[in-house]
């Protein structure tokens, strides 16, 4: 009996278009670099979580079942604490059925996009943006539409004009990140009010990415759900707030019908966020305040120091600076510049990962290594950013 030939193999086009890590082109070079690496490309912290909220602090005796399955929407004490936090700190009037604990904010956004966008429908994304959101929309079979924004818009009216110019009959949602990854900007309330009013007139969803809400140094963070609660899905994370990225715990809040649909998606992908991580998150909400206050000051100082050396405005929030490097490229492509930085051990993220209009920009995170390491990396980067001398 003849054996069948090799079947034709294919992968879904939507997933093939997602792309791999934005750092893939340099991965081998990074691994082979003989000296110290300054990892300014990763949005993370050098700090451990506060004592009492680390995995080593959790015991089975205190938390029976911490290594087992839990409620798919989140352990009840954490959900209760999140309801209280959202009501008091964010001023979002939620009930328990409007809160869903997820496998990180990344998992929460994936669930939300899957719940609100059908295949081929469009999600507007204010650019430059967090690198993963574009791939999340594509992976859920949606179409990301990039709206150059943070370096182009200077008023609430212009903000509305920018999103309106990119809207079509297939548009279903607008993604907004504030405080912004990668720009470090905090969107003013007047701008958010204008965008919320526009979304209401257009009958669109709003995806409000607020994972850096606890790191605001100038201005004031406003949750979009206070302006348009009936159409806003707000997403938060313990990764950034309390240095718990490895725990993979985030949460979303929104209208109960949308949250119910997002919950179904979550059950059939990750099932639920890690149980032990949720107990650590609860400890952070209860006892992590002093740690958060101390870290906020350290982050602010690191950001201001980096901005001063690089000749940039001080960040308003988050833990990033976004730099236009066109003046020093001199006809080269960005990959060559990144390789030159790597010669000094400095790794920064390519701006194209944050939007097609930003291929000649770079993002750096000033909290991904201890302050003395970041300071040295920034000094090395600053040398690479010096304009070429005439005749050189």
Q: How would you label these PLM feature ranges?
A:
Residues 66-197, 214-215, 219-228, 233, ...:
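Conserved core of the PLP fold type I
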Residues 3-6, 16-104, 111, 284-287, ...:
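N-terminal small-domain helix-loop-helix segment of the aminotransferase-like
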């Amino acid at each position: 009996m003849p054996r069948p030939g090799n079947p034709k193999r294919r992968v879904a086009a939507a997933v093939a278009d997602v792309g791999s890590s934005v750092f893939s082109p340099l991965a081998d070079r990074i691994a082979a670099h003989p000296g110290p690496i300054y990892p300014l490309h990763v949005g993370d912290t050098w700090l451990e979580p506060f004592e009492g909220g680390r995995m080593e602090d959790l015991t089975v005796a205190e938390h029976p079942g911490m290594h087992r399955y839990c409620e798919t929407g989140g352990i009840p004490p954490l959900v209760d604490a999140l309801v209280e936090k959202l009501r008091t700190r964010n001023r979002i009037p939620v009930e328990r059925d409007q809160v869903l604990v997820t496998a990180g904010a990344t998992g929460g956004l994936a669930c939300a996009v899957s719940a609100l966008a059908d295949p081929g429908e469009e999600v507007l994304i204010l650019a430059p943006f967090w690198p993963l959101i574009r791939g999340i929309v594509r992976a859920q079979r949606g179409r990301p539409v990039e709206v150059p924004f943070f370096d182009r818009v200077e008023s609430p009216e212009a903000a509305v004009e920018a999103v309106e110019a990119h809207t079509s009959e297939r548009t279903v949602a607008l993604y907004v990140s504030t405080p912004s990854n990668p720009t470090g900007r905090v969107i003013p309330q007047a701008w958010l009010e204008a965008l919320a009013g526009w979304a209401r007139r257009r009958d669109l969803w709003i995806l409000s990415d607020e994972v850096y809400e606890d790191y605001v140094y100038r201005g004031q963070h406003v949750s979009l759900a206070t302006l348009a609660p009936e159409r806003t899905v707000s997403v938060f994370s313990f990764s950034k707030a309390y240095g718990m990225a490895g725990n993979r715990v985030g949460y979303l809040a929104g209208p109960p019908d949308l949250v119910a649909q997002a919950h179904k998606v979550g059950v059939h992908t990750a099932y639920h966020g890690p149980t032990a991580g949720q107990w650590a998150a609860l400890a952070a909400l209860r006892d992590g305040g002093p740690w958060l206050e101390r870290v906020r000051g350290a982050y602010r100082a690191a950001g201001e120091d980096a901005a001063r050396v690089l000749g940039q405005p001080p960040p308003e929030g988050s833990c990033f600076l976004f730099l236009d490097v066109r003046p020093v490229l001199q006809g080269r492509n960005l990959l060559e510049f990144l390789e030159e930085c790597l010669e000094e051990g400095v790794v920064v993220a390519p701006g194209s990962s944050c939007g097609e209009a930003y291929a000649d920009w770079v993002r750096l995170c000033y909290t991904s290594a201890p302050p003395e390491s970041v300071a040295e990396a920034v000094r090395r980067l600053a040398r690479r950013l010096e304009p070429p001398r005439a005749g050189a």
